[in-house]
């Protein structure tokens, strides 16, 4: 299937190595270097130039003064690259494997047919998630830019996508780090001989508190609550002090201190760039796998564990006839791999030019999917144990979804195991490291985008810019730190990010495969890797992946999620508020399209053609070519 781009094709690269550039003294698209990386004459956005040394004063071959000056300005340095290839892989894995892999996949799996759910999940991964993942890695590595300035080289009219991504990242940072703060509060509370969520004798407990595992004879009623549930709801969240979304109450000083510590860790992990964050992920990306292995072995030895495993994997093939199962599979793989957040573009932009991003995409996607699958065993062996201890069905124990599955059900199970303090400490440390990895990545996507777009302002002041970003995210988190903050977290999670990111990636896929052209894109990949993507990838990028995304978007719009948290049902106006928050980021795309068409000179046809045609090196402002110094 041969496709023709809607914009004009770029001239093929003729400057393939340092010697070629030196011979011709030209500014051309850079290709692989002999060392496999970026030579000193290469500029981070994919253009290279080395001043001629063998042409003398021949006026016919002299380089224009403006170009010579430009080269002199940028020749002093290079774009930062990863210290080691494994730093990049661990960073991508740490970003893709997050808290959702632990709490969302197991729940979605058993809700949608158990083992039968793996079939639509794998299909959606092969035809939708992995192609998009591969596309973003290749784009970032070839053009060597963040999510804003990269559009000058693809299709300038869609530059608003980059600004949309930055706003979405701010919304995510506003609630995601609050969940990490909850885990940190649990971790601090775990340093006791007896975990505080095992008893009903604390100041936050109510008369309805009933301990399943008490040696006393107890009667469980419809109004009974477990100590773990009351610890989470009344002590950590203090949600009983809020009347709902319309009155979230005051700010919890305990959670505020926790999130301040979280943001401090984040700042000193990313303030110097990927060379430092690449070292931090050696701990934050590997530690969760050590803990998951320990918990898997421990869970498998618990009484009743097999009940949980059967409940998790027992296939219900009739479920595959339901549209909702396929929607959940598509949404799960998409949000698990995480294209559309600007992170993959940013991380790949620090790779060497001929790094095998195709192999990276397959390896990291496989690791992500396997982690989700194995996490199900970690969760459900413990849920089977809980069901055995309570003499209940696993479905009754597994009714909690989202964070409650971790902070109530799993926390309660850990508290009633031998060596409970040890397991609680490593479990909540694992949650914190999983969350930190994703936050490092999300903020790096924004930082790279802004520094690449405005290097003349921020290139020499990265530390101050990162500090400004972290402080902004902290103040943005204040509403989620209130007594009703959990209501805000749920609203932002469901409406502010999901639909907006889906829209971004849908437009991105169309812009790259239809406007930039899948033929040109495959040519770029061949220039980097030495081989061109096959027909499977081309068909996925042009047709299958956009349909995959459109399918999820339409499903969401037709059946928006009904918001409910604990016993609280969200008011009707909260749906409108959610859509407004989501639209506030996506509006950047049509706004920039309008701005571009209005400010571009010429007739309407000339404006459109110029706006969808990649800019040449001489058209890109000097500020966009100057080095992102870190």
UniProtKB/Swiss-Prot annotation:
Native organism taxonomy: Eukaryota, Metazoa, Chordata, Craniata, Vertebrata
Membrane topology, Cytoplasmic segments: 1-87, 136-160, 272-277, 348-360, 444-463, 517-538, 596-630
Role according to the record: Serotonin transporter that cotransports serotonin with one Na(+) ion in exchange for one K(+) ion and possibly one proton in an overall electroneutral transport cycle. Transports serotonin across the plasma membrane from the extracellular compartment to the cytosol thus limiting serotonin intercellular signaling. Essential for serotonin homeostasis in the central nervous system.
A biological process from GO: serotonin uptake
Disulphide connectivity of cysteines: 200-209
Keyword check for Protein transport: no
Tissue expression remark: Expressed in the intestinal crypt epithelial cells (at protein level).
Binding residues annotated for serotonin, in chain numbering: 98, 439, 494-495, 556, 559
Keywords of the record: Antiport, Cell junction, Cell membrane, Cell projection, Disulfide bond, Endosome, Glycoprotein, Membrane, Metal-binding, Neurotransmitter transport, Phosphoprotein, Sodium, Synapse, Transmembrane, Transmembrane helix, Transport
Post-translational changes noted in the entry: Phosphorylation at Thr-276 increases 5-HT uptake and is required for cGMP-mediated SERT regulation.
Glycosylation sites: 208, 217
Modified residues (Phosphothreonine): 276
Family to which this protein belongs: Belongs to the sodium:neurotransmitter symporter (SNF) (TC 2.A.22) family. SLC6A4 subfamily.
Extracellular topological intervals: 113-115, 187-252, 298-324, 381-421, 484-494, 559-574
Membrane disposition: Multi-pass membrane protein
Remarks, miscellaneous: This protein is the target of psychomotor stimulants such as amphetamines or cocaine.
Signal peptide bounds: none
An annotated Gene Ontology molecular function: sodium ion binding
Domain of life: Eukaryota
Name of this protein: Sodium-dependent serotonin transporter
InterPro entries, A to Z: Na/ntran_symport, Na/ntran_symport_serotonin_N, SNS_sf
Cellular component terms (Gene Ontology): endomembrane system; endosome membrane; focal adhesion; neuron projection; plasma membrane; presynapse; synapse
Renumbered residue ranges of the record's region Interaction with RAB4A: 616-624
Subunit-structure text: Monomer or homooligomer. Interacts (via C-terminus) with SCAMP2; the interaction is direct and retains transporter molecules intracellularly. Interacts with filamentous actin and STX1A. Interacts (via the N-terminus) with STX1A (via the H3 domain); this interaction regulates SLC4A6 channel conductance. Interacts with SEC23A, SEC24C and PATJ. Interacts with NOS1; the interaction may diminish the cell surface localization of SERT in the brain and, correspondingly, reduce serotonin reuptake. Interacts with TGFB1I1. Interacts with ITGAV:ITGB3.
Keyword Methyltransferase assigned: no
Positions of transmembrane segments: 88-112, 116-135, 161-186, 253-271, 278-297, 325-347, 361-380, 422-443, 464-483, 495-516, 539-558, 575-595
Binding site for Na(+) 2: 96, 98, 101, 336, 368
